Design a protein with these regions (language model features):
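Conserved beta-strand elements of the Class I
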Residues: 69-71, 153, 229-233
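Residue-level signal for inorganic ion chemistry
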Residues: 11, 51, 101, 138, ...
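Short, flexible loop segments at boundaries between secondary-structure elements
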Residues: 259, 301-332
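C-terminal accessory "lid"/substrate-recognition subdomains
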Residues: 160-283, 335-340
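A transmembrane-helix-recognition feature enriched in membrane-embedded lipid enzymes
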Residues: 1-36, 329, 333, 337
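Phosphate-bearing ligand-interacting subdomains
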Residues: 278-295
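Phosphate/Mg2+-binding loops and adjacent switch elements
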Residues: 74-212
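Walker A (P-loop) phosphate-binding motif
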Residues: 20-87, 192, 340
Length: 340
């Protein structure tokens, strides 16, 4: 099958390479702004753990006292254009991941907005909030019309960009050469017991630049309910790490799996109700929980739902290194902003 897809991947490579060349040569304009901008993204489609890494970075910035905004595209929403999130918004209006992040930080000095045009979105944020210190761009590595001050590239430990193929043969949005634009690379979803030798071998294989630090992160799961079996509902790109975690904890699950960002339908609701009747506990992710709200499930089922929260953590005691790098960048470059 991959041989059949090879011509299409070569065509895709030609298009993306031409586009990147136009930006590299200055024939297409990368916009700069009078405010620190940190871009978090990946070369592959889905499944790198982007949302918890954005949350980790935003948490650091807020703890440092910076007035921080997240700007996302709002994938899967029904609305268009710029929209600042509020407590009344639903996943249908702003997207599941932006709503998840907004709820995690909504009681702090924090702004969250969505806009498919990142240049327009940044300008609007600066106009509406001229005292902002920093904007974090969520999933914007290929959005080259914006030139951020820090580009953070994520790649999954078990599916790194150097061992993947371009769409449609593989999962890459652009070739592995695009990794050279990154200021920082984070290898995500690593085994928590990763050794320093394994780390060094991995870094050598990625062939990163001498001035391009590579960090390694793992997932920390919150406490689980004391049950031996449960239902599990997911609509995420790669549920395998979660399934492995539940199995390791001795929980047998009946898994109802949907595609990433899936918009639940009436027939899905019926299937979920039937599943819930067979189990005392229904497990789901934070991202799925905000979309499940739209189904208006009965109260007796809502009491069964247990939302699995996660956080990401850097290995090898390197949290302070990356955190201070980003804080120093924002502190050095932050000022009051204005847009013509």
């Amino acid at each position: 099958m991959k041989r059949l897809l090879c011509p299409f991947a070569l065509l895709y490579d030609g298009v993306t390479r031409l586009r990147n060349t136009l930006f590299d040569k200055g024939w297409l304009t990368e916009h700069t702004f009078p405010i620190p901008i940190i871009c978090v993204g990946n070369l592959a489609v889905g499944g790198t753990g982007k949302t918890p890494h954005v949350e980790m970075i935003v948490g650091w910035l807020l703890e440092a006292g910076f007035r921080t905004a997240i700007l996302s595209r709002g994938y899967g929403r029904k609305t268009k254009g710029f929209r600042q999130l509020s407590e009344k918004d639903t996943a249908e209006e702003v997207g599941d991941e932006p709503l998840q992040m907004f709820r995690r930080f909504q009681h702090r000095t924090f702004i969250s907005a969505v806009c498919e045009d990142r240049v327009k979105g940044i300008k609007q944020l600066i106009v509406d909030h001229p005292n902002l210190d920093v904007i974090v761009l969520d999933d914007a590595y290929q959005h080259r019309y914006v030139k951020p001050g820090r580009r953070i590239l994520l790649t999954e430990y078990d599916r790194p960009f150097d061992r993947d193929f371009l769409l449609p043969m593989g999962r890459l949005r652009e070739s592995a050469r695009g990794a050279q634009r990154a200021d920082v690379v984070i290898v995500t979803k690593c085994p928590s017991a990763l050794s320093e030798t394994e780390r060094d071998q991995y870094i050598a294989r990625l062939q990163s630049r001498p001035d391009q630090p590579v960090f390694f992160s793992t997932i920390d799961y919150a406490a689980l309910p004391a049950v031996e079996d449960a239902a599990l509902i997911t609509g995420i790109a790669n549920p395998s790490p979660l399934l492995h975690h539940l199995k390791a904890k001795g929980i047998k699950v009946e898994h109802l799996s949907f595609p990433d960002h899936h918009r639940f339908s009436t027939s899905d609701r019926d299937e979920i109700l039937q599943l819930a009747e067979r189990h005392a506990v229904v497990l789901t992710t934070e991202k799925d929980a905000v979309r499940l709200e739209l189904l208006q499930l009965p109260e007796h089922l809502k009491t069964k739902i247990y939302v699995l929260t996660i956080a990401t953590r850097l290995l090898f005691d390197e949290t302070a290194t990356l955190r201070e790098n980003l804080i120093e960048y924002v502190r050095t470059n932050s000022s009051s902003c204005s847009v013509d």
